[in-house]
């Protein structure tokens, strides 16, 4: 596309009518490279909404890339907003440097976003569940080969992170 920003919406998901407005305003207000929002889930099997709200006490939070990487494990423990491809708006110029790892068939979102966070200057989180993640039959997505591939790709990514080569230095 010819735009300045990119968002990803899965074909079977949907978003609130002000989804892009919320993400765009946060990105512009904070002069960030990436804006992240949270999500709610709709399970097709039981026709129910599942809403989580783990990050209480603030409407918006701003991170440098190093701050986000340092807190990623804690943040990801309760809320997958930072790892999923959905619910974000990104400056398109960052995507010229990073692509999805097509060898990974499960969990490729997290690797992709960690790489983007590493090359971003600032990330803003908006505590708003404007993305609706639709779940149908979860079991069909998790075969043994996909799990093996995912484990191997995560090990490869850990090795990449351990290299500690510029510009991705993790030394304090």
Describe the function of each predicted region.
Residues 9-11:
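Catalytic metal- and UDP-sugar-binding loop of GT-A-like glycosyltransferases, i.e.
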Residues 125, 129-172:
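C-terminal subregions of glycosyltransferases and related glycan-biosynthesis enzymes
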Residues 6:
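Short aromatic/hydrophobic "clamp" motif used to bind/position activated sugar donors
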Residues 14-107, 111-123, 133-149:
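Donor-binding/catalytic cores of nucleotide-activated saccharide
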